[in-house]
From Swiss-Prot:
The keyword Nucleotide-binding does not apply. This is Glucose transport transcription regulator RGT1. GO terms for cellular component: cytoplasm; nucleus. SUPFAM superfamilies: Zn2/Cys6 DNA-binding domain. The gene is RGT1. GO terms for molecular function: DNA-binding transcription activator activity, RNA polymerase II-specific; DNA-binding transcription repressor activity, RNA polymerase II-specific; RNA polymerase II cis-regulatory region sequence-specific DNA binding; zinc ion binding. Residues 49-152, 235-255, 288-308, 321-379, 412-467, 489-541, 636-675, 789-849 are annotated as: Disordered. It comes from Candida glabrata (strain ATCC 2001 / BCRC 20586 / JCM 3761 / NBRC 0622 / NRRL Y-65 / CBS 138) (Yeast). It is found in: Nucleus; Cytoplasm.
Length: 1287
């Protein structure tokens, strides 16, 4: 540390660092630059240790400071504000009992800058002095230089609206400047109180370790308050409460006689009042008599947080960086509020101040139809998803987040608190010393009341007075966050330039004249985008991040509008695999409409769950977005706004960047070119974002489990769906993270969801885990409850009904939409009048009982279908991970045929997974593929028979089991049964609908071909069977079909989405009415034309089909999957490569086998020589010759397809962040032969496990071609058993 020259000690006068550490004498002098000890030990004789401070503390010289003497000579309390340098940290008598321990042990006293309070004069100090109470509390001694901050009921009032009174506005401005000054000094030492509604903090999710989060407030505590707070109690003590209220809202500004709180009118929000949240942030207490058990007055209660460190960063640090939607209020012109302290299942909107409520959906248009246009726009923003289809999407206009009502800007109980939950009391906060009016967006009502601090490294406009104080935050805050990747890339060049220009000094100021070209261009962009960045409604300005953005993770959420997130999901993701197994209308108008208002007892749990569901969905969308060549992965989204679909510069996509290459272009090029460093950065950013998102969801689980009986089933569905989204991301990028999957399985099992699949319906109704009992559930007949529209054999909705529309033939929901007269008419049409009438009476009596069931109970019963679907989806992802990486399954519940039962055609169309019938079929086919993968993973031989493998005397039985399991899997007609039960899907057998359909068929054909090859060897004795023409014909047919399906699959991928990413310029086609009619068997005449137009071989029309050239009159169903991403893309690519590598030489081998059989037949040694004397031998020979010729022709075409498959595999590059590479197989040249050692090395794994060559007799004469085919079968079995990816 620096010292004066006269006081600086020479190195000779003290021991060197090494001698001091060893506590020996140092003999270094001016003649010798090294001491004897260091010279002998070969150590460096250095003096780098900073000498300890000696002498008395600074406090002993306090009286010698003239400025402090000046302050101490004035005993009056108004003298506290004469000089800012005289402000010191106060201590009260009761500090040891009431103060925070961290604040009691502060050592240094911060001194304010002289410039921070230069505008404060004596007159203003008098106004502040009046607010402080006018007299000193007897319990607090008046000492020199201390700050007596007001108690809870007397903190300064917030500046509300326009300056209607000069004195009121001046006092408020001075109060703002003073408290800003006090905040800069005192914040690290004070436990800042925050206020909330009565006793609502006791259920906070932030007190996971303890619910005792409410502490009694001591009036003697010295507190610091945010200048943006507004208290209804402070309004009482102000001289004229109406001065700060505009004239048009005076009639609506109501203050209760008990001074509990004030009700903010609807016009406050519509007029752009930035203090609309004041009643929430300042702690306006809502009457709640249920939990008002404390004897202490509510205005004397103080809330303290016992937040775990990992959750401190959750509710504010990452939340503050996202836009916020204003709190829902009453309709336009209404001033009354109806509060409900129970956990409602849907948000309700009050109609013009009356007590009636109206559901959100189509009725909301009527509720706001008579209001002004501004009120209508605001009403559309009150609720998140009820107006999804009608919400406007301005580019640089209002950018309210639809999830804003879920406290995306932090829990509403934290509003108004200076100290963030992400910071400890001893952590300094970077606070802007300028007036709040100078902050960007300070007068913008749509931006949260938080200072937007410019980044001094990325924003050249920042001067010295605006530099942010660097803080040391606990490691657990950065546990799952890294520095912003984009900011790091942009600031690296600036940092390097700063070091060079400042002579290597860190933080040196760069001269204005020596700015680089990049910095000038950055300034130019800032000037151009100044209006859009600062005047827009988005809090996420790319160049002016919040303080939280400077210290938090590199993945910044909230950069895509919530409406766009839902639209993008249902357009590009849902058809490929319904990770959210529900249609868009039900999701937006029912599931996501939950109670997240602050007066709810568990509103923070609801807000937290929905927030991270939204963030998980954004993470999925941004990872899947197609990356341009000049943009670095998903962190290149620098411009908030809607995603554009049209082409052109003005309609540039969301993740597009300007054409001019900037500093980040080299980084983007390195990533796109496969540079290891660039890919490592991308992987690091992705893993950080995924771990953070997953950790936040897991952190809330104890609170969800604790309140599982009070939490709405909607919240449970959203919470569990978040885990499905994260596992989808893992499958999409090919990331093997067993921790995410394992924890997801654990949480699903804690919800006991497996009982819904394994227990009978009546047992489920009586299980307390699902809130059912004997009175709540009416057990109808099993066939009535489990009635699916697929029961009539067609699997289609009657009359093509869609969710939300009544079904005219059968009741969509027998519990609510039952029509006795309609059923009586149906029973009369049945012919058997008496039997139908009795049956109708029985059903009518049961439904009559069910009508009296409460709505919540009925909803819980209907939600069980969602829990079943989510558990099935998790099982599918578990199976996919097992097939990819070869690990064991974690969930062993059988899900065979669950797609038809729980996903296809439920009784209530509200719960269908898709509105469109064609798109629904595409999703069902993907789910059917998940069933097949689950069956493959569950029936893996190496997992089920590992206990028998070690028995050497039972090898032949094991081989028999292998053949049996292969035969069972190859004969699995489940896919064909699925096509037969769902009439209309036979159209897709001729024309594939999606890639999942062809991949499903490829897996089944692979199993069949493997069985055909292994059947050439007798499992009992290990001998090879003789090859005949009939057996050879079966093998050739199986091989050609497999190769044809692989080529068709890869061709379809090339046409639909070769990169498996979301391209906004390549969108799916909306299904036409003709497609819907044909699929619902209304127009079966054109079925033949579709099938005939698509009967093309894979050889000649390859390039035509690759380019997607079809006749204009043909219906191309696969266009609905164009641009759609799939979680199976990684598995498809690697499995296709593995099969291609294993069978690429098989057509050549089979051609030689065919030719060998013909030669044997000509010489009379043919195996098939059982012709009767009456048969014509010439005709038989001719028939065999024709068969052989056909086989050779098919095999020749297959060889051509193999070449095309190799070309396509090199062209298809799906999105993957982790390059696992492809499996390598050693080719066995059967024509030239290999030595015995090479053959042993090439021996398949399962063959070595199940066969011991010493015990198996070797056949005398073995055809090497047949041996090669059998070894190919074993290799295919290894691929199925050990995983698609290399281990």
């Amino acid at each position: 540390m620096p010292h004066n020259n006269d006081k600086k000690r020479t190195n000779v006068s003290r021991a060197c660092d090494q001698c001091r550490r060893k506590k020996i004498k140092c003999d270094r002098n001016q003649e010798r630059n090294i001491c004897t000890s260091c010279q002998r030990n070969g150590e460096r004789c250095k003096f780098e240790r900073v000498p300890l401070k000696r002498g008395p503390s600074k406090g002993a010289h306090k009286a010698s400071d003239p400025e402090l003497k000046l302050s101490s000579n004035k005993p009056s309390k108004s003298s506290l504000f004469e000089d800012s340098n005289s402000i010191i940290r106060p201590k009260s008598v009761g500090e040891d009992s009431n103060m925070d321990p961290l604040s009691r042990h502060g050592s240094n006293t911060p001194i304010l800058d002289n410039n921070s309070n230069s505008g404060i004069n004596d007159r203003n100090m008098g106004g502040i002095d009046d607010r402080l109470g006018g007299s000193t509390d007897p319990g607090t001694p008046s000492r020199s230089g201390s700050i007596l901050l007001p108690p809870l009921g007397q903190y300064p009032q917030q500046q509300n609206y326009t300056n209607n009174s000069t004195s009121a506005s001046n006092n408020m401005l001075n109060s703002t400047s003073l408290n800003s000054t006090i905040l800069q000094q005192q914040q690290p030492f004070w436990k800042v109180p925050y206020h909330e509604f009565q006793n609502q903090r006791r259920g906070s999710i932030e007190s996971l370790q303890s619910d005792l989060s409410v502490r009694t407030f001591n009036p003697q505590d010295q507190l610091v308050y945010n200048t943006f707070q507004q208290s209804p109690i402070a309004m009482k003590h102000s001289s004229d409460p109406t001065n700060s209220i505009p004239p048009n809202t005076k009639s609506q500004h109501l203050t209760t006689t008990s001074n509990i709180g004030s009700v903010v009118g609807a016009n406050d929000l519509l007029s752009g009042n930035p203090n609309y949240w004041g009643s929430v942030r300042a702690g306006s207490f809502i009457p709640n008599g249920d939990e008002n058990d404390d004897q202490i007055p509510q205005n004397l209660q103080r809330r303290s947080s016992s937040i775990p460190s990992i959750l401190r960063n959750t509710s504010t640090s990452i939340l503050l960086s996202q836009p916020q939607l204003p709190h829902p209020t009453n309709g336009a012109g209404s001033t009354s509020n109806n509060f409900n302290n129970t956990n409602d299942n849907s948000n309700l909107i009050n109609n013009k101040g009356t007590g009636s409520t109206a559901g959100l959906g189509n009725n909301i248009d009527n509720a706001v139809g008579s209001a002004s246009p501004q009120a209508q726009r605001q009403s559309q923003q009150l609720y998140s998803y009820s107006q999804f289809l009608n919400q406007s999407k301005p580019y640089n206009n209002q950018n309210f987040s639809s999830f804003g009502q879920f406290s995306t800007n932090g829990f509403q109980s934290r509003h108004g608190s200076i100290t963030s939950e992400a910071m400890s009391p001893s952590t300094a906060l970077g606070y802007n010393q300028n007036n709040s009016n100078n902050l960007p967006g300070a007068n913008n009502p749509n931006i949260s009341d938080i200072s937007l601090l410019p980044n001094k490294e990325s924003d050249p406009r920042v001067n010295d007075s605006q530099k942010v104080v660097k803080t040391e935050v606990s490691n657990d805050i950065f546990q799952f966050g890294e520095q912003n990747l984009a900011n790091t890339i942009e600031s690296n060049a600036d940092k390097s330039e700063d070091k060079v220009k400042s002579g290597g000094k860190k933080g040196g100021k760069v001269p204005r004249k020596r700015k680089t070209k990049q910095v000038k261009e950055s300034n130019k962009k800032l000037k151009v985008n100044k209006k859009s960045n600062f005047d827009s409604d988005s809090i996420n300005s790319p160049k002016v991040p919040t303080p939280v953005q400077q210290i938090k993770t590199g993945f910044q959420y909230g950069q895509i509008l919530d409406v766009e997130l839902i639209d993008l999901y249902y357009e590009f993701i849902h058809v490929g695999f319904p990770v959210i197994p529900l249609n868009k209308q039900t999701l937006t108008n029912d599931i996501l409409l939950v109670n997240t208002h602050p007066y709810s007892n568990i509103h923070e749990v609801n807000s937290y769950v929905i927030l991270w569901f939204r963030n998980s969905l954004e993470l999925l969308v941004r990872v899947a977005l197609k990356r341009k060549n000049d943009s670095p992965f998903f962190d290149s989204h620098n411009t908030p706004g809607p995603l554009r679909s049209a082409s052109g510069d003005e309609n540039m996509a969301f993740n597009d960047t300007p054409k001019k290459k900037d500093i980040t272009s080299s980084h983007a090029d390195s990533i796109s070119s496969g540079d290891d460093n660039g890919m490592a950065e991308v992987q690091s950013a992705f893993i950080s974002a995924l771990n953070e998102c997953f950790q936040r969801v897991v952190d809330i689980h104890p609170k969800v489990r604790e309140n599982k009986d009070r939490i709405s089933p909607k919240i449970k569905i959203i919470y569990l769906t978040t885990f499905i989204l994260l596992n989808y991301i893992l499958a999409l990028v090919g990331y093997d993270n067993s921790f995410v999957l394992g924890m997801s399985v654990t949480i699903f099992n804690e919800f006991k969801l497996y009982k819904l699949l394994v227990l009978p319906y009546k047992a489920i109704c009586q299980d307390s885990e699902f809130s059912f009992n004997a009175k709540q559930s009416i057990s109808l007949d099993d066939d009535f409850i489990e009635n699916k529209n697929i029961g009539n054999g067609n699997g289609n909705r009657t009359n093509g009904s869609t969710p939300g529309e009544p079904n005219n033939d059968e009741g969509e929901n027998a519990l609510t939409n039952f029509n006795p007269s309609k059923e009586q008419q149906n029973s009369q049409k049945g012919g058997s009048g008496e039997g139908n009438e009795n049956q109708g009476n029985q059903i009518r009596s049961k439904i009559g009982k069910a009508v009296n069931i409460e709505e919540e109970t009925e909803t819980n019963e209907n939600y069980t279908i969602m829990f079943k679907r989510l558990y099935i989806l998790l099982t599918m992802f578990d199976s996919l991970q097992s097939c990819l990486f070869g690990g064991p399954k974690l969930l062993n519940v059988c899900i065979t045929n669950t797609t038809e039962k729980f996903f296809s055609g439920t009784t209530n169309s509200k719960w269908n997974i898709e509105d469109s019938l064609v798109r629904e079929k595409g999703a069902l086919i993907s789910l059917k593929l998940g069933e097949t993968l689950s069956e493959i993973a569950s029936n893996r031989i190496i997992m089920n028979h590992f206990d028998i493998i070690t028995l050497t005397n039972n090898n032949q039985a094991n081989a028999t089991d292998i053949v049996f399991n292969l035969k069972k899997l190859s004969n699995n007609r489940d896919y064909d049964n699925f096509l037969q039960e769902n009439k209309g899907l036979e159209l897709f057998d001729q024309q594939p609908l999606c890639i999942s359909q062809l991949f499903h068929k490829m897996l089944i054909m692979k199993s069949s071909f493997t069985y055909q090859l292994l059947s050439l060897m007798d499992a009992n004795n290990g001998n090879f069977v003789n090859m005949d023409l009939k057996r050879l014909e079966q093998i050739v047919e199986s091989l050609c079909s497999l190769i044809s399906v692989i080529l068709q699959l890869l061709t379809l991928i090339m046409r639909l989405n070769p990169t498996n990413s979301i391209d906004l310029n390549y969108r799916p086609v909306t299904p036409t009415q003709r497609m819907e009619d044909m699929l619902s068997n209304k127009n079966t005449d054109s079925t033949d034309s579709i099938s005939n137009s698509n009967k093309t071989n894979s050889g000649n029309d390859f390039y035509r089909r690759l380019l997607g050239l079809e006749h204009s009159n043909d219906i191309v169903y696969s266009d609905i999957s164009r641009g759609v991403i799939s979680p199976f893309a990684m598995a498809i690519l690697h499995e296709s490569h593995n099969i291609h590598e294993l069978i690429k030489m098989t057509p050549t081998i089979l051609i030689r086998v065919v030719m060998t059989l013909n030669v044997q037949d000509d010489t009379g040694n043919s195996v098939n020589n059982n012709a009767t004397p009456g048969d014509h031998e010439e005709d038989m020979k001719l028939k065999r010759a024709n068969t052989s010729q056909d086989l050779v022709y098919k095999l020749s075409n297959s060889m051509n397809d193999v070449v095309q498959i190799a070309s396509l595999l090199s062209m298809i590059k799906p999105l993957k962040l982790f390059d696992h590479g492809f499996k390598t197989f050693e080719s066995e040249d059967v024509l030239q032969g290999n030595d015995e050692d090479a053959k042993k090395r090439q021996r398949p794994v399962l063959k070595r496990l199940f066969y011991d060559t010493t015990n198996v007799p070797k056949p005398e004469a073995v055809d090497p071609l047949v041996v090669s085919l059998v070894n190919t079968g074993w290799n295919l079995l290894d691929d199925m058993e050990l995983g698609f990816l290399p281990q």
